[in-house]
């Protein structure tokens, strides 16, 4: 067999280029209808990859929304996507068409990391029987272990005391509060999943926090986007292992905790935690190949709850303290309400929330302004849908831009400013506009929302009950900007926590 040389090689190259362009043209042609959402013209093969800033997607989408409207299209590689913006369009997609937009697309990097049929957890699982079974189990089990009940409130209250002790130990010193906040929230989640609490100085806890941070960084930005666009790259020997070291380490940590729990589990005793309850379900369905209760799915469900339940709440608390040192007038007013309703001795309780409209408004405004999850995880349409008179075909990937709702200029008086009055009426009563969607909406809304609301209220009020927070002397005023991607955390900052005196 002769090797191709000269003119032959040129012929093959030209044929390959023409073939790629024809395939690209066919991909585009199926979307060239008068009712398909408009968008920037994609490049061959790369699509719009070079036309958006993957390190600051919310701003890129904001500019595109201003140009093309609330519903516009993008193409990332071969994949066509439709971005949904604004309250009206978001309600149509997540609520009106909720049944047809609840599915998830396949994501190659997650498949490489072990997300596959039978072990997809809750967050990434396709919309169907397995997802329903696991979501129903997670919601009911968390409820049985105290979600919204007094038992869980006691756990959070006790952890709030440990958190205050940690701040007391460093009172008056410039500190970055993030590690302490992460520790507190992690312990609440660990209590629910493993019935276990870690001391804040525990090397295992410190290691877990670092690995979790690394794992989230690995699945965001340019490299994972390119791997998803061209999954053949995942077959390059050694590349995936190097790119996803944090993910592998996190999986090993979770597996170790599950092994410890499994070794002490007594099936004849009532379950101590969510893991025990899942193990009991595995025993019940032994021999049923269609059940989603298995060891692999246990690992994924725990990963879902542990990662999503921890980083979102701790990051929101970090935003809360930053905004308090930037707005001391708001901080003083919250403390006045705490003193009037709770006092400075009794521990805050969830029952206090209804009598604290200003504090409640501040917590909600922190969530709106912090906007820690600007982009929902992608959805995929299971049938043709109509949104704002546009026709979105079956199999289209949807990107819900939640930031566009939390900053919707038609809803919020001062969308780009921290303004707790967004959640107060003229009489000072708490109100919640329908555009407040930090936990998403519809069938895929965050199952841990009740837990997050409890943690935010109890941790925040306990901290402001005991401390006043300020910018350290001699340091510049921190910026109130976030660092994309998920979760959008504040730029690193320091604060001083000073213990409040009685009556102050």
Curated annotation (Swiss-Prot):
Localization per Swiss-Prot or TrEMBL: Endoplasmic reticulum membrane; Microsome membrane
InterPro entries from the UniProt entry: Cyt_P450, Cyt_P450_CS, Cyt_P450_E_grp-I, Cyt_P450_E_grp-I_CYP2D-like, Cyt_P450_sf, Cytochrome_P450_fam2
Coiled coil spans: none
Induction details: P450 can be induced to high levels in liver and other tissues by various foreign compounds, including drugs, pesticides, and carcinogens.
CDD domains assigned to the protein according to its UniProt record, in alphabetical order: CYP2D
Residues with PTM Phosphoserine: 249
Root EC class: oxidoreductase
Signal peptide limits: none
EC number(s) from the headed UniProt entry: 1.14.14.1
Keyword set, alphabetical order: Endoplasmic reticulum, Heme, Iron, Membrane, Metal-binding, Microsome, Monooxygenase, Oxidoreductase, Phosphoprotein
GO CC annotations, alphabetized: endoplasmic reticulum membrane
One Pfam family cited in the UniProt record for this chain: p450
A single MF term (Gene Ontology): heme binding
Gene3D superfamilies: Cytochrome P450
Substrates-to-products reaction catalysed: an organic molecule + reduced [NADPH--hemoprotein reductase] + O2 = an alcohol + oxidized [NADPH--hemoprotein reductase] + H2O + H(+)
Membrane protein topology class: Peripheral membrane protein
Binding annotation for heme: 446
The keyword Acyltransferase is assigned to this record: no
CC cofactor: heme
Function: Cytochromes P450 are a group of heme-thiolate monooxygenases. In liver microsomes, this enzyme is involved in an NADPH-dependent electron transport pathway. It oxidizes a variety of structurally unrelated compounds, including steroids, fatty acids, and xenobiotics.
Family named by the database record: Belongs to the cytochrome P450 family.
Protein name, entry field: Cytochrome P450 2D10
Organism: Mus musculus (Mouse)
Gene (name only): Cyp2d10
């Amino acid at each position: 067999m002769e090797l191709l040389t000269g003119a032959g090689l040129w012929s093959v190259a030209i044929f390959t280029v023409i073939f790629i362009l024809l395939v690209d043209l066919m991909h585009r042609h199926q979307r060239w209808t008068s009712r398909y959402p408009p968008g920037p013209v994609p490049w061959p093969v790369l699509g719009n990859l070079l036309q958006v800033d993957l390190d600051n997607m919310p701003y890129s989408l904001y500019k595109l929304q201003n140009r093309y409207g609330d519903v516009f299209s993008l193409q990332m590689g071969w994949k066509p996507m439709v971005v949904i913006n604004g309250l009206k369009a978001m309600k149509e997609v997540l609520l009106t068409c909720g049944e047809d937009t609840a599915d998830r697309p396949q994501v190659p990097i997650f498949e490489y990391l072990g997300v596959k049929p039978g072990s997809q957890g809750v967050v990434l699982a396709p919309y169907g029987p397995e997802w329903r079974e696991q979501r129903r189990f997670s919601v009911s089990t968390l409820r049985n272990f105290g979600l919204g009940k007094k038992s869980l409130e006691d756990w959070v209250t006790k952890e709030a005391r440990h958190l205050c002790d940690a701040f007391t130990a460093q009172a008056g010193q410039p500190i970055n509060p993030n590690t302490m906040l992460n520790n507190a929230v992690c312990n609440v989640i660990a209590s629910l999943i493993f019935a276990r609490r870690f001391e804040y100085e525990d090397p295992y806890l410190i290691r877990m926090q670092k690995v979790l941070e690394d794992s989230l960084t690995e699945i965001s930005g340019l490299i994972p986007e390119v791997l998803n666009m061209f999954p053949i790259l995942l077959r390059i020997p050694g590349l995936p292992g190097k790119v996803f070291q944090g993910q592998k380490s996190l999986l090993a940590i979770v597996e170790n905790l599950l092994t410890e729990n499994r070794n002490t589990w007594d099936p004849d005793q009532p379950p101590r935690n969510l893991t025990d309850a899942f193990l009991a379900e595995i025993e019940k369905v032994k021999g049923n190949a269609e059940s989603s209760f298995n060891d692999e799915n246990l690992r994924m469900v725990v990963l879902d709850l542990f990662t999503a339940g921890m980083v979102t709440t701790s990051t929101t608390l970090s935003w809360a303290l930053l905004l308090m040192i930037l707005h001391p007038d708001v901080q003083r007013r919250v403390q006045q309400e705490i003193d009037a309703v709770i006092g400075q001795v009794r521990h805050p309780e969830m029952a206090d929330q209804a009598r604290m409209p200003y504090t409640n408004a501040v917590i909600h405004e922190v969530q709106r302004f912090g906007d820690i999850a600007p982009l929902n995880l992608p959805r995929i349409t299971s049938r043709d849908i109509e949104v704002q008179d546009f026709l979105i075909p079956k199999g289209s990937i949807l990107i819900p831009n939640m930031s566009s709702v939390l900053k919707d200029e038609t809803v919020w008086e001062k969308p780009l400013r921290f303004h707790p009055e967004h959640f107060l009426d003229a009489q000072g009563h708490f109100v919640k506009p329908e555009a407040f969607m930090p936990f998403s909406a519809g069938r895929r809304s965050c199952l841990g929302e009740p837990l997050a609301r409890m943690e935010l209220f109890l941790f925040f009020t306990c901290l402001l009950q005991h401390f006043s927070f300020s910018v350290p002397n001699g340091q510049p005023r921190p910026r109130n900007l976030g660092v994309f991607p998920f979760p959008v955390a504040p730029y690193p900052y320091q604060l001083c926590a000073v213990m409040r005196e009685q009556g102050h």
